[in-house]
Structures are given as structure tokens and as C-alpha cells.
Amino acid sequence: MKKILLACSSGMSTSLLVTKMKEYAQSIGEEAEIWAVGQDKAKEDMRKADAVLIGPQMSFLKSELQKEADQYNIQVEVIDMMAYGMADGKKAYEQALSLMVNQ
């Protein structure tokens, strides 16, 4: 099962995207645990994830979060702006999968 963490300022703006990503994963027959947290819980929760996507408003924290993620051998990336704005679950899910290629 793929485990994908989404983080944004409060965890609210990514909740719709989480739903859309889950729907897409289910539609292609994949099992995925996808959840959202606020930026204050991102470092704590990332140890349970295979990939971390962060909201565009958190892009300034990417390098700090990646340093933390390195100890768990996971990648952190800013959610594609179009996928984020359009709540495109397919695009965001595929972005998360691309971060897991080397695992």
C-alpha cells in the first residue's frame, strides 16, 4: 500500500485533493493511504509516508522538510500548482508516485 502525506498551512485546503486522489487510486485498482495535515504536524507524520506533497503556500519550507525526510529516505515536493488549484487527484497522485520510483 502506498502512503502519501499532503501538508498545507492548516491541512484544510488539501482535504479535497486527498479525496480526489483516493478516488483516483481506487479507480485504477491501487490501495493507497492518503492523508492531510497542517504544517505543524508534517515532520511528525512524514515518517509514516512513502512520499510527501506540500501545498504551494508552503514551498518556502521545502528544503527544511526535505532535510527531515532524508532520514526516512522519502522525497518532498511542492504540489503541482494546476493540480492543486483544480483539485486534480489524478495529476497529484501521479506526482506522488513519481517520488516513490527510487524506493
Swiss-Prot record:
It catalyses: D-cellobiose(out) + N(pros)-phospho-L-histidyl-[protein] = 6-phospho-beta-D-glucosyl-(1->4)-D-glucose(in) + L-histidyl-[protein]. GO terms for molecular function: kinase activity; protein-N(PI)-phosphohistidine-sugar phosphotransferase activity; protein-phosphocysteine-sugar phosphotransferase activity. Keywords: Cytoplasm, Kinase, Phosphoprotein, Phosphotransferase system, Polysaccharide transport, Sugar transport, Transferase, Transport. Induction: Up-regulated by konjac glucomannan and by cellobiose and mannobiose, the possible degradation products of glucomannan. Repressed by glucose via the carbon catabolite repression system. Also repressed by GmuR. It is found in: Cytoplasm. GO terms for biological process: phosphoenolpyruvate-dependent sugar phosphotransferase system; polysaccharide transport. One of its GO terms (cellular component) is cytoplasm. Pfam families: PTS_IIB. It comes from the Bacteria. The active site is at C8. Residues 1-103 form the PTS EIIB type-3 domain. It is an enzyme of class 2 (transferase). Its EC number is 2.7.1.205. InterPro entries: PTS_EIIB-like_sf, PTS_EIIB_2/3, PTS_EIIB_3, PTS_sugar-specific_EIIB. The modification Phosphocysteine is found at C8. Its main location: cytoplasm. The PTS EIIB type-3 domain is phosphorylated by phospho-EIIA on a cysteinyl residue. Then, it transfers the phosphoryl group to the sugar substrate concomitantly with the sugar uptake processed by the PTS EIIC type-3 domain. The phosphoenolpyruvate-dependent sugar phosphotransferase system (sugar PTS), a major carbohydrate active transport system, catalyzes the phosphorylation of incoming sugar substrates concomitantly with their translocation across the cell membrane. The enzyme II GmuABC PTS system is involved in the transport of oligo-glucomannans such as cellobiose or mannobiose. This is PTS system oligo-beta-mannoside-specific EIIB component. It comes from Bacillus subtilis (strain 168). The lineage of its organism: Bacteria, Bacillati, Bacillota, Bacilli, Bacillales. The gene is gmuB.
